[in-house]
Amino acid sequence: MRIGGYRLRQHLKMLAPMFALLLVVWALRWIIGSLGTPGWLLQVMSITAATPVAVLLAVLVIHSRRFGGYVNVVVSSFLLNFWAESLVVAAIAFSVLTGISNVYAVPEFSVTGPDPMHLRHIRAHLTFSIGIGTLAGAAMGCLLLFLLRRLVPAKPAEESPAINRWKP
């Protein structure tokens, strides 16, 4: 199956550094939260804030390597948001299964009301967070790609050696 002229594997390969960035932010937030650091530091290490940054980085890669167009931006936004929310859900599930609290399952970052198994919290991450994050990231990314194409035209295909690496 091709999406915007490229296979899913090619999208995943292109997004690998952004996946790694999100994984590092997720792990650092978990570690910092376990150490009992101040709340402002937890807010700095936010996977919710890192995901749009990863989408913008993906758009820069898409533009500089001529890796498709707006469809590829939307797919990249979805894949990055899905990865980020899957990491958060894994941390919440770990907390529920082991009984060890972590920053992702504390009440101030959870859905209000009685939910000892965090099912509503997990469901919210898998539905609303992925959906809204994908739409917001795609809108922001498509706007950036539009501006980049108007203001900074990419080099012709034959001049850039990095382009051939991403061809199907």
Please report, for each region that a protein language model flagged, where it lies by residue.
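Juxtamembrane/disordered regions of integral membrane proteins
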Residues: 1-168
